Amino acid sequence: MGNISASITSQSKMGKDFDAVGFVKDFAAGGISAAVSKTAVAPIERVKLLLQVQHISKQISPDKQYKGMVDCFIRIPKEQGFSSFWRGNLANVIRYFPTQALNFAFKDKYKQVFLGGVDKNTQFWRYFAGNLASGGAAGATSLCFVYPLDFARTRLAADTGKGGQREFTGLGNCLTKIFKSDGIVGLYRGFGVSVQGIIIYRAAYFGFYDTARGMLPDPKNTPIYISWAIAQVVTTVAGIVSYPFDTVRRRMMMQSGRKATEVIYKNTLHCWATIAKQEGTGAFFKGAFSNILRGTGGAFVLVLYDEIKKVL
């Protein structure tokens, strides 16, 4: 009973200590920096997605598939127009604003739970594990709320049609069409493997970044180039480690809206097995180099977030 009472008292105290202003600042700083960076790297993002899903796209025949990142960059403006590089970007910004903002905001709240009373100087491994846990939990929580928008972004970016040949005319049309054909399940296809991937990615993304910065003598006054270097390494490593999960979830997303006879993967496990068997393990990393370049935007988000918080 004593432990239960102590737990309740601790939770009550945490509720009273909740900083509403700080929460809003976290939300605003994370959202603004994310929206700016995602728009800047949108062309790379679209190339990466096309390389990931073209193998099962109904719009891209085997002889029309992109040979690689450079080929994709050259052909997109020729075949679909220059502005098509930003196809799906609006959905991405709308999705990314709450996603990143919630990630950053809840990350700090989870840190209160996992890192309360932990001394980083004398309890390094507990501090490290707490950062991993808070980062992973924040990412998974956010994903539950915004997955349909992530789904729509993927389908819009994968749409290679031009004019009347496009599969979807926009965000609303995409969500409506899939909901009518597949129901809410269609909008959450690939959710399971997404949660697995997001936990791995966010755990590394936030965990290693916060741990590295926490080990610096004066984290708040760290030169921006050092913060940038740390962020760049973190986003690259996290992206490569979780990339196969991302490829599988994108492939699963591409199946929504298809007739039963056109469905390629029975479930997530079948998707993993089929890709490995038919395309080889290298297929799990298609577009990975584009993802590393895109990671520059992710590193920019982390650094810009810290800078905006200083202003706010």
UniProtKB/Swiss-Prot annotation:
Start-end of each Solcar repeat: 21-113, 126-215, 226-311
Alphabetized SUPFAM superfamilies for the sequence: Mitochondrial carrier
Reactions catalysed: ADP(in) + ATP(out) = ADP(out) + ATP(in)
Main location: mitochondrion
Entry's transmembrane regions: 23-52, 90-114, 125-145, 193-213, 225-245, 288-305
InterPro entries for this protein: ADT_euk_type, Mit_carrier, Mitochondrial_sb/sol_carrier, Mt_carrier_dom_sf
Binding site for ADP: R95, K107, R249
GO molecular function: ATP:ADP antiporter activity
GO cellular component: mitochondrial inner membrane; mitochondrion; synapse
Alphabetic keyword roster: Antiport, Membrane, Mitochondrion, Mitochondrion inner membrane, Repeat, Transmembrane, Transmembrane helix, Transport
Keyword Transmembrane part of the UniProt annotation: yes
Region (Important for transport activity): 249-254
Record motif Nucleotide carrier signature motif, residues: 249-254
Function: ADP:ATP antiporter that mediates import of ADP into the mitochondrial matrix for ATP synthesis, and export of ATP out to fuel the cell. Cycles between the cytoplasmic-open state (c-state) and the matrix-open state (m-state): operates by the alternating access mechanism with a single substrate-binding site intermittently exposed to either the cytosolic (c-state) or matrix (m-state) side of the inner mitochondrial membrane.
Protein name listed in UniProt: ADP,ATP carrier protein
Organism: Drosophila melanogaster (Fruit fly)
Higher taxonomy: Eukaryota, Metazoa, Ecdysozoa, Arthropoda, Hexapoda
